[in-house]
């Protein structure tokens, strides 16, 4: 490769990445998932597009795809809270295993019939598109305000279901290449090996990396690089010994993100940029790889297969996978079924048959690409609409306009929160001493216009003041009520109900107040405990229960305990204006 070729490579790469970033602003305006924008830029620059770039290097696409996916999963694991596991771990694992099997089987049967393939080739297509995509899910769910049970289930599922899809794909390719026509017990043992070694190396490698980071004294910019290199080492080792590298790097990130770690905010900040670069690079390469005119001959059967998977296979897999978990409302199941987003993983898996030289390998790739495109356009575009229709959106928590970490101690979790005081806030005109600040927080600075003031207890807050507060992440809900822009009160009333009651209120007192019948229910128990029992599992904000003709909604939690409950009356029925 001469100097001119290298320079052209840099030039083309910089133009494509820059274009992807610039046109990504169209995503929110047009309501199109940003990943589709990246994919479209690659296709436009490709063989059939205006760029005319011929790219058919499948091993290179496989390399870029795996590297990008590893970085995205590492970042996703770092941002996943272990606390979300209390409501979603087992349901997500059920969907990641049983759900993928059901989706693979149903999609494979349809694929074999639609494309006149052997049943094992049909199953191979089903396995290739059988898993939801972490990059797509993390990208499209961020900031949507979904309830915790739905968000956690979808994110954990997308981070843990790739091993099953990879395993099924590799196994079926080996069977087709060797002429096998049946399954053996080795199939199950290999699956257990993938999950077992992946989990062991992911958690073990994450723990060792955590100890190394907290004991090393490095320049601040080197810690994120150490995390990335360590995560990739875990990924590669797990693959080398027959485990799941995808699961391993996700669990490695999960452990690092939920333990005190040196330079946490620097790591998260850089990983955020790297994850975006990985998504852009991966979808650009995959867009360049496809030849759009090859998709037209298979468009109708591929569209039928995509709709079959979206409307039949995915919903049935969710329905079967969530049977043991009664906490899930039908609305939540329907939304989880709809957000079975496919992304880069199926396209990367579709490269496997090409590299193995299987007959019909190009067909498998084109079908997988078409299904991903339909999934992102149909499911991804309709996600906000579906969330509102199925009522899985909860009113957002107020948040600071910015936050930054304070590395006071190697494992310090102190942060600086910046709040802009809007004129609608009740605290305008109040003295600082009147504010009920959370214990352990301090007001560090107050800006008025361009002036830095020295705040004291007698300082009166004015509209458009900027407050800087030092505290911890768990202080954010209380601080938000004091300083942040409050959400529309009408939105809260419409969602949580006409009145909000304390979860500790005695059920018999609530029944007496609202004229309700207990009908054998223990009236001595707290309202929150009764609602939790009716939900049938770990509660999340937004959970709803119908009882005595009223709608009871979980409005606030304290740990696993329901702290506040909203009550909504049917139209035309008034209730007492009291708070218990």
Swiss-Prot record:
Cell division keyword on record: no
PANTHER family to which the protein is assigned, alphabetical: K(+)_H(+) ANTIPORTER NHAP2, NA(+)/H(+) ANTIPORTER 1
A single Gene Ontology CC term: plasma membrane
Full protein name: K(+)/H(+) antiporter NhaP2
Protein's UniProt keywords contain Iron-sulfur: no
Segments traversing the membrane: 3-23, 34-54, 58-78, 95-115, 122-142, 163-183, 185-205, 218-238, 241-261, 270-290, 303-323, 335-355, 363-383
Location (main, coarse): membrane
Cleavable signal peptide: none
Annotated function: K(+)/H(+) antiporter that extrudes potassium in exchange for external protons and maintains the internal concentration of potassium under toxic levels.
Intracellular or extracellular location(s): Cell inner membrane
Lipid bilayer topology: Multi-pass membrane protein
Taxon lineage: Bacteria, Pseudomonadati, Pseudomonadota, Gammaproteobacteria, Pseudomonadales
Keyword annotations from UniProtKB, A to Z: Antiport, Cell inner membrane, Cell membrane, Ion transport, Membrane, Potassium, Potassium transport, Transmembrane, Transmembrane helix, Transport
Any GO BP annotation: cell volume homeostasis
Reaction it catalyzes: K(+)(in) + H(+)(out) = K(+)(out) + H(+)(in)
Organism of provenance: Pseudomonas paraeruginosa (strain DSM 24068 / PA7)
Database matches in NCBIfam families: PRK05326.1-1, PRK05326.1-2, PRK05326.1-3
Family: Belongs to the monovalent cation:proton antiporter 1 (CPA1) transporter (TC 2.A.36) family. NhaP2 subfamily.
GO molecular-function terms, A-Z: flavin adenine dinucleotide binding; potassium:proton antiporter activity
Boundaries of every RCK C-terminal domain copy: 403-485
UniProt-listed PROSITE patterns: RCK_C (PS51202)
